[in-house]
């Protein structure tokens, strides 16, 4: 398999794009060849990427009681997970959280809200918060508010939001096995609406929900077709009370191989390590940044805790990587 890895590297540096057939062959590599694939992915990142690691942060601005039945999610009203439920947080609390994350080294900040989407009335106080964040911080502003229409997304852009987060979560084939209350095409429609509104879209998914590596590859090609420039990679954190609470995690090397493949399929996109990396990768959690990743979600996640921002920044510096603005 060394030959196909090297041929792929040469083709990418010559300006070709990875095709689905070759990606499928690379997905079958095992053993020490995985390390070769990771090294090639690192070189591809260094050649096509921005040269610095981008750090984003979030606040769980509205939690629980979600109408959707995503099988991985603790916030779904369909499941029995023990999770805090509250409406939109006080604006001062959100702005305070943003200031803390900015001081600790984050470059981006996003409100994340539970629920299918937002009505125009529900969106109004959120817009006011973003206008405050634009005035009172230097953070790049992101939003993750579910399924919205283009008019709503344009209002977010006018309030200062430059990036909209809306995951595909899985491949088209596998998606119906994790969610039945909305469709894959509805997610794609929101992504296209955000792009039409002038925002960059951040979209990826979750590994280790029971999908195959071919499902992961198919999602990467879907993301490429959509022109996605920031790809968050989450790894399932099985939460008690959700349908996936007993789902076995894929091995760390399988995760690293998948990350490397994403870099080869999406050579110039941000590959952003997000939730679940601590538990799934264990002692190998620095290695995604050797396998092609160049961004990270830092601080706490939605319903689980991450490492401290300082720990992640130190890890990146120990790897010899540059961090934006630091």
Curated annotation (Swiss-Prot):
Any GO MF annotation of the entry: 2 iron, 2 sulfur cluster binding
Domain Radical SAM core: 48-277
Keywords for the protein's UniProt record, in alphabetical order: 2Fe-2S, 4Fe-4S, Biotin biosynthesis, Iron, Iron-sulfur, Metal-binding, S-adenosyl-L-methionine, Transferase
Signal peptide start-end: none
Residue sites binding [4Fe-4S] cluster per the record: 66, 70, 73
Residues reported in the UniProt entry to bind [2Fe-2S] cluster: 110, 142, 202, 272
EC number(s) reported in the record: 2.8.1.6
InterPro entries: Aldolase_TIM, BATS_dom, Biotin_synth/BioAB, Biotin_synthase, Elp3/MiaA/NifB-like_rSAM, rSAM
GO biological process: biotin biosynthetic process
Catalytic activity: (4R,5S)-dethiobiotin + (sulfur carrier)-SH + 2 reduced [2Fe-2S]-[ferredoxin] + 2 S-adenosyl-L-methionine = (sulfur carrier)-H + biotin + 2 5'-deoxyadenosine + 2 L-methionine + 2 oxidized [2Fe-2S]-[ferredoxin]
Pfam families: BATS, Radical_SAM
Domain of life: Bacteria
Cofactor: [4Fe-4S] cluster; [2Fe-2S] cluster
Keyword S-adenosyl-L-methionine set for record: yes
Pathway: Cofactor biosynthesis; biotin biosynthesis; biotin from 7,8-diaminononanoate: step 2/2
SUPFAM superfamilies: Radical SAM enzymes
Cofactor binding remark: Binds 1 [4Fe-4S] cluster. The cluster is coordinated with 3 cysteines and an exchangeable S-adenosyl-L-methionine. Binds 1 [2Fe-2S] cluster. The cluster is coordinated with 3 cysteines and 1 arginine.
Family the entry assigns: Belongs to the radical SAM superfamily. Biotin synthase family.
Record note on quaternary structure: Homodimer.
Function noted in UniProt: Catalyzes the conversion of dethiobiotin (DTB) to biotin by the insertion of a sulfur atom into dethiobiotin via a radical-based mechanism.
Protein name in the entry: Biotin synthase
Species of the source: Heliobacterium modesticaldum (strain ATCC 51547 / Ice1)
Source lineage: Bacteria, Bacillati, Bacillota, Clostridia, Eubacteriales
